[in-house]
């Protein structure tokens, strides 16, 4: 539905980086981690210790973040990330049938942004549904679930749902551009929802 779309150079680079990252991550995460740490050691040596980051660990490679300016098309990139992840995940699942993802969840900072994500997903022909506590997790099992972060709580109430009810092996995409939750609550929710899955 988005015929004639022309990627800007920085969008193209972000998508290309994601392709390379997911390819290495799903092909052999341990070797990928080793290669990253080799690069870190070289960077530290070449910078005489000025570049000195903590080493990567394989269990922490399931997170990938992009910082994008307002109006740079981060929503569109996020939706492309869904398609990219599912492509590499399905390819890896043919080799390792134990791989699983429970849900694809887009966490939006408020109800207005949730509706915007839903509209944009429809334009990208990605099946999606707004999370409604009464109706559960969408019409189809593989629908993308869009949820307002403010509806996630430790314990579900009338208008909220417990963050633990989503399980931990989800693909979670967080729109942090307009963060709606104070402190590190959004970080905790993202971490728990994607602990055994993946997060953008």
Regions found by a protein language model. Name each.
Residues 101-102, 167-169, 196-200:
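Short glycine-/polar-rich loops that comprise or flank the Walker A/P-loop
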């Amino acid at each position: 539905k988005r015929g004639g779309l022309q990627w800007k150079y920085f969008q193209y680079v972000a998508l290309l980086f994601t392709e390379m990252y997911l390819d290495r991550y799903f092909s052999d995460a341990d070797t990928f981690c080793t290669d990253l740490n080799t690069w870190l050691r070289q960077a530290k040596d070449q910078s005489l210790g000025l570049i000195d980051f903590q080493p990567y660990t394989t269990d922490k490679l399931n997170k990938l973040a992009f910082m994008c300016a307002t109006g740079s098309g981060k929503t569109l990139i996020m939706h492309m990330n869904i398609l990219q992840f599912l492509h590499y995940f399905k390819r890896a699942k043919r080799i390792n049938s134990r791989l699983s993802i429970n849900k694809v969840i887009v966490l939006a900072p408020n109800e207005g942004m949730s509706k915007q994500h839903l509209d944009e997903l429809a334009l990208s022909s990605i099946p999606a549904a707004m999370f409604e506590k009464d109706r559960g997790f969408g019409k189809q099992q593989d629908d993308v679930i869009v949820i307002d972060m403010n509806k996630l709580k430790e314990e579900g109430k009338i208008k909220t749902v417990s963050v633990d009810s989503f399980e931990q092996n989800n693909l979670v995409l967080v729109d942090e551009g307009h963060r709606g939750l104070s402190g590190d609550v959004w970080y905790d929710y993202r971490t728990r929802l994607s602990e055994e899955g993946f997060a953008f």
